[in-house]
Design a protein with these regions (language model features):
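Short strand-coil-strand connectors
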Residues: 13, 47-50, 165-166
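Short, solvent-exposed beta-strand edge segments and adjacent coil->beta transition regions
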Residues: 5-7, 75-77, 167-169
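Conserved active-site tyrosine of GNAT-family acetyltransferases
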Residues: 18-23, 94
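Short, extreme N-terminal leader segments that mark the start of a protein/domain
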Residues: 1-13, 21
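Short, structured motif recognition centered on aromatic/hydrophobic residues
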Residues: 5, 22, 51-57, 77-84, ...
Length: 191
């Protein structure tokens, strides 16, 4: 029902300072971001390492839904986003188990979501969403469209890079012996 933790969302007052901290100091790579004028905030996804992601959010003016959260702090973890392959199946499960949810939204194939309030989730705001993870990542953090793997010469062997089902890509350096063994095992599967 839940595929994985997709990202941790951090709300901040000082976006430029947070951007410098996460991208310049910790190496987070910017991905997709957007401003929501109705809710008066901006969000942006960042990739850390090979599969970890975080989201930075900040208000764009007074009346933002983040005002209450940021009224007593400079920033902090706002919510955790979990990925599901089927939001309707999850919704039905929550109703069956009498777990309240709110904020259900359906943006078509791009994004479907609902939230579980912290009072019903042990103090944590949980966003559950159905989406295509690669849609939210920067190009350098994912395989090109239609490509699921690549192999490149490196040192005395090669580096195999594969698309990850949770979005992004993972690279595995292999020495010459490991590369030959992998090629032999793949070949034997095809015989």
């Amino acid at each position: 029902m839940i595929s994985r933790i997709d990202h941790v969302s951090i709300a901040v007052k000082d976006y430029e300072r947070a951007l410098r901290f996460f991208s310049k100091l910790l190496g987070a790579v910017p991905g997709v971001g957007m401003e929501d004028p109705n809710m008066k905030y901006v969000w942006q996804i960042f990739s850390l390492g090979d599969l970890s992601r975080l989201e930075l959010m900040h208000p764009t003016g007074s009346g933002s839904f983040l005002d209450g959260f940021l009224s007593k702090r400079e920033g902090g973890v706002h919510h955790i986003t979990l990925e599901t392959p089927d939001i309707e199946k999850l919704r039905a499960f929550l109703e069956e188990e009498e777990i309240p949810y709110f904020g259900r939204a359906d943006l078509g194939e791009t994004w479907k979501e609902l939230f579980i309030h912290p009072r019903d989730a042990f103090g944590v705001l949980i966003q559950v969403a159905e989406f295509h993870p690669d849609d939210w990542l920067g190009d350098s953090e994912k395989m090109p469209p239609g490509q699921r793997f690549s192999v490149a010469k490196s040192g005395d062997g090669c580096t195999v890079t594969v698309a990850h089902p949770g979005g992004g890509k993972v690279s595995i350096p292999l020495n010459a012996s490991e590369a030959r063994r992998l090629a032999d095992e793949i070949s034997s599967c095809l015989d």
